[in-house]
A protein has these predicted regions:
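Ala/Thr-enriched low-complexity intrinsically disordered regions
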Residues: 3-4, 30-32, 43
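Bacterial N-terminal signal peptides
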Residues: 19-30
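N-terminal secretory signal peptides that target proteins for export/translocation
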Residues: 1-13
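Low-complexity, intrinsically disordered short segments enriched for Gly/Pro and polybasic residues
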Residues: 1-4, 20, 36-37
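Alpha/propeptide regions of enzymes that mature by internal proteolysis
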Residues: 39-419
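Short, hydrophobic alpha-helical membrane anchors of single-pass surface/secreted proteins
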Residues: 14-18
Length: 419
């Protein structure tokens, strides 16, 4: 743990404690100098309870394809993830998550990329250039809605400062968001340069922290605590042996369905419940709000270009639908996909106008197994975001975690555990 003190005009000294967790995860809890007990209790109020199992560990096996070794987006070689979780006082529950396609200079070694929009009620900065040029040139960062401009500005600063970028005059930061305003002081715009730099610099391969971490700290899904989730699928050698990894930031609603079982309905928490039962919506509960958004980040080592990456991203929406998402008017549903295939990197030097690419690409016919892989990985990543999240309090509101024991009972009842 590293503790740094900062001066403040309005407060006394601020104490910022940074805890390094899995895959570069960091928690920043800021309090006025009231002693370590108050700092500890603040973090405990926001993220209470012991670590919870992932969906597969609890017996929920999704689909037919096997997961990668970590069952995470980091199963795609070279991909790393970093989180900064911001917990301050009683009202700040937010953060930043960074996904790096590789560990080099992304501007000088761009990766093929694409964005697919399921519903465009969102602020995905940088998406138009990605789809125009078919390239991603910065880390993919996720945050809270009103933090997008601040995070984008910080990503630009980070990229401009990299050795080799001294002559760069245009940067396209790719920043996704969901609205965490129910639990978080969203108007405070608490993620800035320091947090973004920390998320990028702390990014690591290996196991990825899930649940109430990074950009998922203050999110809500299906009326329960949402967050960050990840999963992967590995194709057999006969199909190329490629890996597809997915990371999600869940903050949307609907009627939670797990492996086809009506979990949300049997838990009594689902979209339109009040209208269907009382014919009125004068006092709708949290689960009755389907809005909020989801960002789906997809990585693969398969050699596919922008066109087929966009097709891959589109199929992730089928995995989203499998979970019971309502696809509401107010939910910004976005998928970002990139390939890490080294032969497809767009290498740019100061004078590279005549660069040619001649890499072999997968055919359209070879895409179908990858489509199934991304559907399954997206579905399981969403479940992991719910299974790993913990009950969280912020801004006077408490959002309960998905009750795992009761959920497993429902799944057993419907024969939805295992294969």
């Amino acid at each position: 743990m590293k503790t740094t003190r900062y001066g403040s005009k309005k407060n006394k000294r601020l104490r910022i404690s940074v805890f390094v967790l899995l895959a570069g995860a960091t928690i920043i809890s800021t309090m006025t100098s009231m002693g370590p007990d108050s700092l500890k209790s603040s973090a405990q109020r926001s993220q209470s309870g012991p670590a919870r199992q992932r969906a597969r560990e609890a017996g929920v096996a999704v689909g037919v394809l096997p997961p990668g070794q970590l069952n995470a987006i980091t199963d795609v070689a070279g991909v790393s993830v970093g989180h900064v979780t911001i917990i301050r006082g009683d009202n700040v529950r937010t953060g930043v998550t960074a996904i790096l396609p590789h560990g080099g200079n992304l501007f000088r070694e761009k990766v093929p990329g694409a964005v697919f929009i399921g519903n465009a009620f969102g602020k995905l900065a940088g998406s138009t250039q990605v789809n125009e040029l078919g390239e991603i040139e910065t880390p993919v960062t996720l945050t809270s809605t009103l933090n997008v401009p601040r995070v984008a500005d910080a990503v630009i600063d980070y990229m401009l400062a990299l050795p080799g970028n001294e002559d760069v005059q245009s940067i396209n930061p790719l920043v996704g968001e969901t609205n965490d305003g129910y639990l978080n002081d969203i108007r405070g715009r608490h993620a800035g340069r320091e947090e973004v730099f920390a998320a990028i610099r702390n990014a690591r391969g290996g196991a990825v922290e899930e649940g109430c971490v990074g950009a998922g700290t203050g999110t809500v899904a299906f009326g329960f605590k949402g967050g960050i989730g990840t999963s992967s699928r590995k194709l057999p050698p006969s199909l190329g042996g490629y890996t597809v990894g997915v990371l999600v930031q869940t903050n949307f609603g609907g009627v939670l369905t797990i492996n086809g079982a009506p979990v949300g309905r049997e838990l009594g928490r689902y979209y339109l419940k009040e209208e269907l039962e009382t014919k009125s919506s004068t006092n709708p509960g949290l689960a009755n709000n389907p809005d909020g958004s989801i960002i789906i980040v997809i990585a693969t080592d398969a050699p596919i270009d922008h066109r087929n990456l966009q097709r891959l991203a589109a199929r992730s929406m089928m995995g989203l639908a499998r979970t019971g998402a309502a696809g509401s008017n107010g939910s910004g549903d976005y998928a970002i996909a990139f390939s890490t295939a080294s032969d497809l990197r767009i290498r740019t030097a100061a004078n590279s106008r005549n660069q040619k690419t001649a890499a072999a690409l997968l055919s359209n016919d070879a895409m179908s197994p990858l489509f199934l892989a991304v559907i399954e990985a997206t579905e399981e990543a969403i479940y992991n975001s719910l299974f790993r999240a913990t009950t969280t309090t912020g801004r006077g509101h408490t959002v309960e975690a998905l009750p795992i024991d009761r959920t497993l009972e429902i799944l057993r009842k419907h024969g939805a555990l295992g294969h």
